[in-house]
Amino acid sequence: MKIKFTKMHGAGNDFVVIDAINQSIHFTPAQWQHLADRRFGVGADQMLVVEKPQAAGVDFRYRIYNADGGEVEQCGNGARAFVKFVTDKKLTDKQAIRVETMSGVIEPRLEANGQITVDMGAPILTPEDVPFDVSGLLCKAEGADTLWPLDIKGETHWISVLSMGNPHAVQVVADADHAPVREDGVLIEHHPRFPKRVNAGFMQIIDPHQIKLRVFERGAGETLACGTGACAAVVSGIRRGLLASPIKVQTRGGELSIAWAGDNSPVLLTGPAVTVFEGEIEL
């Protein structure tokens, strides 16, 4: 089976994007893993699939597969790549589109300066809906947020727990560059209190309008940027009284801009999307 693809990235978070409107695809988890492999495949953090919509009132269906072959609910940086792809391929002539995902509808739009803004919807703040098992835990309040203790290697990490369509655990660190992201990230991802696993964010506060962030992504490991992780970190920081919107998020792959007006308001994610190359692969 030969598949045409486009390699893209958003702030270094890289993707293989596949048009499933004009070609038929039927991949196994092993084939997704092969496609993501940086030595034997194309190489990517996630694979993004463009499909015809199934729901009424939307323009496209957006599906996301992690490097481990598992399908996931949401990817903010990928949403920007998705918009650039459907625009460049002339699959739409709209500046703003409605896109169906596993976790609901998102509304990305192409800005005049070439940046792309994605309305990521309102965060989910109820632990049980993330999901996160709070049984037997004693939480503490910080500002409007609730912090939960998580035991990692015998040490207590105080985390914010929320969902941006996918689950996130966010903690504040003194120095993001030297935080044990890979060592602790995998333990947080697979912690038994997260039945669907979790994305682990390590946030350093620079000032009230700027943070440095590293994210260990569920099913992908540490990536150069994570859009939903940036949104989750900003929501956590604002609710804790540490940040004020808008916020610049420095990732290892570039800068993202996040705006959030508070509980029940949508989180707006703005950043770049870049096409690297196009190709064809036999699977």
UniProtKB/Swiss-Prot annotation:
This protein's GO CC annotations: cytosol
EC number: 5.1.1.7
Protein's name in the database: Diaminopimelate epimerase
Primary location class: cytoplasm
Cellular compartments annotated: Cytoplasm
Phylogenetic placement of the source organism: Bacteria, Pseudomonadati, Pseudomonadota, Betaproteobacteria, Burkholderiales
PROSITE patterns: DAP_EPIMERASE
Binding site for substrate: 13, 46, 66, 76-77, 166, 199, 217-218, 227-228
Biological processes annotated in GO: lysine biosynthetic process via diaminopimelate
Pfam families: DAP_epimerase (PF01678)
Active site: 75 (proton donor), 226 (proton acceptor)
